[in-house]
Amino acid sequence: MIAPHIPVLARPVSEWLGAVAPLRRLLDGTLGNGGHSKLLLAAHPELELLGIDRDREALARAKEKLNDFADRCTLVHGEYADMQAIAAAHGWESADAILLDIGVSSPQLDEARRGFSWRQDGPLDMRMNQEQALTASRVVNFYGEEDLARIFREYGELRQARKFAHAVAVKRAEKPFAGTAELAEFCETVLGRSRPGKLPLPTLVFQALRIEVNGELEQLRNGLRAALALLRPGGRLAVISFHSLEDRLVKRFMQEAARECVCPPGLPVCVCGHHAEATLPVRGVITADEAEVAENRRAASAKLRIMDKVSR
């Protein structure tokens, strides 16, 4: 049963993107259920939407949700890293505003058959794009032990990554892992119970597998570059992330895009000739207030960063 989907940070997203003038073209690279886009379409009668998602089920839900604005919406099955090519294919030379809401969605987590959650039993799938070949089962049961250790360490930030990867390799040699509940129980058998106040260890393992299956960090790196290129001068990018790996990547990208000088430290004068490509109207992150967190627990970990493309 899918719980009603509540878009996180809906008010700040609507306010910051709604403040762009003129606001005629919005590209939502992670459309999901279309909650953020619906709010902006309702508030801006001239706004056109190009919505992209690699999950066809999400696109179907968004199409229904955005039915009242169908004449202003173009929905595309694809990856947001390819937004420049997708935009060009639909006659868009640029966008006034771009929104990226990174990571797994609540409906994906709520559907056991999608295999994203360790809290309910389902297949080891975790594909956002169900048409791709690579699944979590393939990663867990066939990746080499060294690759598994790297994935658990880098993507899950798991302290016992090598120990867990070795245990997985030994266990699967006897019998391959079949489902999410089995893997979650195995996590606790090998790694022990999570410490109070810390993320459950299965959460870290499942996060690592999901990021690997969907190539999420590479998608984000490429998507950020594509977004900056596609924005018109004066356009605005809003990015919502949910864990430190994503947020560090977004923060670093935006800070570098906003740097005026890239000379090595210590030079008496600037000789690089570099100019900032963007400005940061908000220093730091925007987070949910207590009222939103009370209504939607997932909002507690959401971080919104804003970047404007320089007008020249």
Feature map (PLM): residue ranges:
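S-adenosyl-L-methionine-dependent methyltransferase catalytic core, i.e., the SAM/SAH-binding region
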Residues: 1-312
